[in-house]
């Protein structure tokens, strides 16, 4: 479209022309196109650094979750609380299980409160050297051990019972078989007697060195350890079913060599199924220690449904009929 300017105002042509230019400017300029349409791509300005939205960069993109930012799933290792100083504090129960309330003065309470060495400590032999196999234990108990090769597997369990009965003043229950029908009653020892062994015969004889002190208890145990073992211990047990397992029970194979491990804690599910911890001494004489479970080494609990025979522990495999209860755990 073309405009033809005709001014009919005499003497005012310049003024009228200037007004016409102003009108054209307000209407988008002069020419055939008129105003620029915004939907006409040919009329959009070329992009510049100032008006382009920047592409996302590594710093501006929300990162994908990584292994360190994702909350880990619970694992079997979560049942071990390394700062724990006692059996109960160190070993948490598995999901779905709970410990029954422990009554003071019971073997369960005694063992749950039993002090442990710091996590990661090695098992030491009676002479202070390291045991060769350091991969079998989950914790080391602070059970006393003397500087001689006597307190081995059965002896360690007798030591646990003797310490418990002595501390709770149940002296009449400290009594162990030496074989051949001879029973080493600690109460008799406390009354001023000792045991004389000659060949296969043992008998009580008076002794001024025997009394009710703790030092005298250790002398009594030293003699018991020298003349007893898994064979005599097995004779003081009875078979039990796995669903009846409780603290103080044992898996035992009597003989020479034999072996025995002890149940030191038990927890239960609501349906009554149990899980338990095992501990042992061994030969040569060594510190009493909580065992790992070879089925899942990061979780030391043994589960009732896993008890099948042969029953495997880290350093010994037990046959059917080995789960038993000691007469002094009645």
What are the functions of these language-model segments?
Residues 29-33:
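Bacterial signal peptide processing site
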Residues 2-17:
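Bacterial N-terminal signal peptides that target proteins for export
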Residues 274-330:
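Low-complexity, Gly/Ser/Thr/Pro-rich intrinsically disordered linker/tail segments
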Residues 16-27:
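Bacterial N-terminal signal peptides
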Residues 45-47, 54-56, 63-65, 72-74:
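Intrinsically disordered, low-complexity proline-rich tandem-repeat tracts
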Residues 214-272:
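...with weaker cross-activation on analogous glycine-rich loops/strands in unrelated enzymes
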Residues 34-46, 73-133, 147-152:
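N-terminal module-boundary/linker segments of secreted carbohydrate-active enzymes
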């Amino acid at each position: 479209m073309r405009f033809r300017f005709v001014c009919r105002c005499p003497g005012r042509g310049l003024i009228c022309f200037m007004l016409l230019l102003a009108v054209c400017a307000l209407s988008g300029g002069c020419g055939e196109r008129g105003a620029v349409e915004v939907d006409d791509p040919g009329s959009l300005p070329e992009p510049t650094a100032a008006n382009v939205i920047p592409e996302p960069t590594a710093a501006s993109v929300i990162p994908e979750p990584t292994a360190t930012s994702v909350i880990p799933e619970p694992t079997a290792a979560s049942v071990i609380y390394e700062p724990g100083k006692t059996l109960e504090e160190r070993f948490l129960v598995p999901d779905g299980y709970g410990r029954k309330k422990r009554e003071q003065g019971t073997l369960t309470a005694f063992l749950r409160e039993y002090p442990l060495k710091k996590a990661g400590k090695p098992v030491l032999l009676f002479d202070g050297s390291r045991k060769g196999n350091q991969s079998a234990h989950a914790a080391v108990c602070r059970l006393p051990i003397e500087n001689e090769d006597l307190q081995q597997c059965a002896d360690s369990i007798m030591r646990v019972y003797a310490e418990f009965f002595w501390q709770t003043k149940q002296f009449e229950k400290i009594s162990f078989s030496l074989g051949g029908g001879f029973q080493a009653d600690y109460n008799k020892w406390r009354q001023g007697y000792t045991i004389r062994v000659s060949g296969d015969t043992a008998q009580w004889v008076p002794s001024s060195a025997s009394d009710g002190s703790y030092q005298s208890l250790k002398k009594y145990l030293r003699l018991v350890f020298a003349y007893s073992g898994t064979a005599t211990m097995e004779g003081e047990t009875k078979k039990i079913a796995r669903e009846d397992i409780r603290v103080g029970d044992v898996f035992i194979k009597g003989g020479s060599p034999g072996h025995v491990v002890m149940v030191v804690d038990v927890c239960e599910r609501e349906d009554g199924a149990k899980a338990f911890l095992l501990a042992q001494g061994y030969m040569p004489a060594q510190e009493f220690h909580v065992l790992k479970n070879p089925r899942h080494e990061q979780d030391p609990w043994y589960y009732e449904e896993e008890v099948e025979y042969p029953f495997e522990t880290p350093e010994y495999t037990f046959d059917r009929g080995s789960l038993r209860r000691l007469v002094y755990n009645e």
